[in-house]
Amino acid sequence: MAIPLVLLLAWLLPTVFAASLTQVSNFGDNPGSLQMYIYVPNNLASKPAIIVAMHPCGGSATQYYGMYDYHTPADQYGYILIYPSATRDLNCFDADTAASLTHNGGSDSLSIVNMVKYTISKYGADSSKVYMTGSSSGAIMTNVLAGTYPDVFAAGAAFSGMPFACLSGAGGADPAMSNQTCSRGQINHTPQEWAAYVHNAYPGYTGQYPRLQVWHGTADNVISYTDFNQEISQWTTVMGLSFTSNQTNTPLSGYTKMIYGDGSRFQAFSASGVGHFVPTDVSVVLDWFGITGGGGGNGGGSGSTTTTTSATTTSTGPTGGCTAAHWDQCGGNGYTGCTSCASPYTCQKVNDYYSQCL
């Protein structure tokens, strides 16, 4: 039986005009030789927000697009998605060269920023609502962009990353490279030294740095949990924030949400027993960015139970005669360093794996 033309068109239109992930060939200067993919929803908001979503090593833009569903909420809220795709070093983003770790230095970080500028210009996007997220290599790149282009990004969410500049000079960013000093958690600096790497990436910058969420699994055997603790100390020092409290079983059972300051600028999530890498909770990320919430990121999940505990003193006695300075680590499962804090500070438990002189 013949199908009436009107019914045929009604069936075809949603398929023909549905938004899809599309490659952009000419977005501007591309010193990192990255590929750019973009998702622009049909229901585009006036002055839409932008989310840059970055894949892990060995991944691609199309792979990461399919891994976590940011595009369905984009259809509802009208934001634009940018998916950079790395093409070198086992498809890892450049987080080790001076070019990528320097404001306007070039390489991958500048390529991604030029993708953002292209999108703002072409679609009238809101330059004050540019966000970034990623897993593993994408999480490391989130830290890189937060340090090198704090004037471009408003907030970020990094899943299983490491501190800014931890890979500096490593000669590569893939997990199989010979120099695994950073990924094994063997690079240790004071919080002030970690913060200096960030400040030196953009000399003269005096504005705010992006609000950040960092997530890490305690059983990560690719990027050490120590890197998570260093990541926390780096950014809380840059932002001038102190540990406030823990919220257990948030947003899932076994996860601990760590609040710094009032929780509006920096949050950390420790996932007990989770390996590499922590799965992305899209709803929590969108809330943190302010797309579905107020931008403070309450981090609650359906069915989760939350208890709040303030920092507690774990040790003030010396071990081996050494003393940890203000902000330094002083305890935690597997920790073998100084447990005595310089006066007047005390060693306060942040979680089972990390205590800090506060």
Swiss-Prot record:
A GO MF term: cellulose binding
Signal peptide annotation: 1-18
Gene Ontology biological process terms, A to Z: xylan catabolic process
Region annotation (Disordered) ranges: 297-318
Active site: S136 (charge relay system)
Region ranges (Gly/Thr-rich linker): 292-321
Enzyme nomenclature, EC number: 3.1.1.73
Keyword annotations: Carbohydrate metabolism, Glycoprotein, Hydrolase, Polysaccharide degradation, Secreted, Serine esterase, Signal, Xylan degradation
Stored SUPFAM superfamilies: alpha/beta-Hydrolases
Pfam families for this protein: CBM_1 (PF00734), Esterase_PHB (PF10503)
Major subcellular location class: secreted
EC top class, as a word: hydrolase
Compositionally biased tracts (Low complexity): 304-318
Domain CBM1, chain residue ranges per copy: 322-358
PROSITE patterns linked: CBM1_1 (PS00562), CBM1_2 (PS51164)
Family: Belongs to the carbohydrate esterase 1 (CE1) family. Feruloyl esterase type B subfamily.
Role description: Involved in degradation of plant cell walls. Hydrolyzes the feruloyl-arabinose ester bond in arabinoxylans as well as the feruloyl-galactose and feruloyl-arabinose ester bonds in pectin. Active against methyl esters of caffeate (MCA), but not sinapate (MSA).
Name of this protein: Feruloyl esterase B
Organism: Talaromyces stipitatus (strain ATCC 10500 / CBS 375.48 / QM 6759 / NRRL 1006) (Penicillium stipitatum)
Biological classification of the source: Eukaryota, Fungi, Dikarya, Ascomycota, Pezizomycotina
